[in-house]
């Protein structure tokens, strides 16, 4: 598939916590859609190795969530560094979307951008500076059309790839019910 500047790059990451100054990225997933939100390509989900001291520093919520999903075990056995994950994800994106054209798409995406800016700056700079943040629409729907907010339920698995598909489906829902498109 050739590069298309109208394609959208969706990203989700799992981290050891919410502070990009002290916490680390442990899982990255990318999906490319066309402008109508049809999936065009899915990158392999990559797990970043992090040392035990980083994993042991996670709070109870993260230890429980990432333990139940099996992600902690995957992190321990992964041989991929942050730099290797960044390089592989860039190689994937270069096949589908020209640099600097797609906003960063997802839910609460500025949190992902903060982590990328610190730990994977080349990947962060591949995106346009704008964000397509589905959580913005959720907040607007709560205020402008609260009756539709109960109509979409995310799976909430806290697994990067599943969370991307949740975000895409949520945006499709708002496109239909908030914008009537």
Swiss-Prot record:
The active site is at residue 129. It is found in: Cytoplasm. GO terms for molecular function: 3'-5'-RNA exonuclease activity; nucleic acid binding. This is Oligoribonuclease. Keywords: Cytoplasm, Exonuclease, Hydrolase, Nuclease. SMART domains: EXOIII. Belongs to the oligoribonuclease family. Coiled coil: none annotated. It comes from Nitrosomonas europaea (strain ATCC 19718 / CIP 103999 / KCTC 2705 / NBRC 14298). It is an enzyme of class 3 (hydrolase). GO terms for biological process: DNA metabolic process. Pfam families: RNase_T (PF00929). The keyword Hydrolase applies. SUPFAM superfamilies: Ribonuclease H-like (SSF53098). GO terms for cellular component: cytoplasm. Transmembrane segments: none annotated. The lineage of its organism: Bacteria, Pseudomonadati, Pseudomonadota, Betaproteobacteria, Nitrosomonadales. The keyword Endoplasmic reticulum does not apply. Its EC number is 3.1.15.-. Residues 8-171 form the Exonuclease domain. 3'-to-5' exoribonuclease specific for small oligoribonucleotides. It comes from the Bacteria.
């Amino acid at each position: 598939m050739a590069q298309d500047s109208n394609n959208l790059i969706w990203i989700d990451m799992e981290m050891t916590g919410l502070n990009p100054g002290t916490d680390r990225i442990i899982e990255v997933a990318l999906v490319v859609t066309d402008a109508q939100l049809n999936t065009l390509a899915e990158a392999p989900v990559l797990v970043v190795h992090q040392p035990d001291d980083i994993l042991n520093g996670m709070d109870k919520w993260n230890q429980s969530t990432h333990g139940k999903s099996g992600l902690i075990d995957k992190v321990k056995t992964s041989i991929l560094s942050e730099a290797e994950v960044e390089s592989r994800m860039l190689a994937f994106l270069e096949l589908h979307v020209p640099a600097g054209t797609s906003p960063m798409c997802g839910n609460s995406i500025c949190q992902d951008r903060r982590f990328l800016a610190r730990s994977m700056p080349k990947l962060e700079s591949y995106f346009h500076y704008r964000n397509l943040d589905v959580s913005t629409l959720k907040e607007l729907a709560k205020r402008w059309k609260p009756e539709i907010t109960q109509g979409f339920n995310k799976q909430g698995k806290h697994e990067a790839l599943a969370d991307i598909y949740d975000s895409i489906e949520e945006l499709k829902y708002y496109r239909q019910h908030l914008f009537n498109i």
